[in-house]
Amino acid sequence: MIEICFIIPARNMDTLHRTLSMLSFQKDAGFRVLVADRSGTEAAHDVAAGFEHQMTVETVDLENSGLPLWKQCLDAARGAEWVCFLTPQVDLTPSSVRRMSRCIEDHPSYDIFHWNLTAPYRKYPLKTRPAGFFRRVFREGDVAPISSFVIRAQVLREAFAADPDAAGMDLAVILSAARKTGIRSARWERISYNAPAPVDDPAWVEKDVRARLAFFRWSEGFFGEEDYPLDTGERLTLYANELARLYPSFTYEELKADLNSFAVVSGPFRKMRAASVLKAALKARQESLA
């Protein structure tokens, strides 16, 4: 069975305990857990220690060493073939880990898998979905934040080694670098409730994976708001400029549609404000290039 390393930030001990409890019920599914801690205290170690008899779990203390936090996590997940950066907003369904493993085994040439969290619950009305249901509602075709991506670790290692200066301080940039350098073709797999349905259109893959990873760069962040000390307008402006850089041929309407889809699922990003900030950012960029 494929081994997946789930990397969890130790931001809130109650949330950490709940997430580890969910994973402990799937201990025979073939995975291990890495708790990433920046607090400098023993709290996360104590919580993780309570689950060591149920599953493979360890805690890594992150440092201000100049390396991106995600890279420190990746180094600590030594030997892991697949990694999933699991943010606290994501709740695992009972069969999700096994389903991911089966999809990876069935499609060995793919490097990135999308884990469609909402699919098992489409039969439930919104108000009666099980407690702890993933708190963001996606329309058909929408894509979850990076925490629903399972990524081949070697893709990240090779991309970082090829151009560490271009990696920035977040995972979105290094994945973008992996696409540009052609180290591997980041393939896409939607893990659905039923049979997996590969999406092989390169243009669709390029747009969806890179745009949404670029968005994550300016959203909540893996380790929380303290890593992104910007108000909503500043984040939206940065996001707009990032999208314009990645996709110079995109029209304003295309970019606005992308931004509005994110505004639906991200609390601070309200549609009208998002659209107006994006329009202003793109206008400023066009003027600077004129």
Each predicted region: which residue ranges?
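Cell-envelope/extracellular polymer assembly enzymes that use nucleotide-activated donors
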Residues: 2-5, 32, 172
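Short acidic donor-binding/metal-coordinating loop in glycosyltransferase active sites
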Residues: 62, 87-89, 117, 169
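Acidic donor-binding segment of Leloir-type glycosyltransferases
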Residues: 24-59
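C-terminal subregions of glycosyltransferases and related glycan-biosynthesis enzymes
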Residues: 26, 172, 179, 192-290
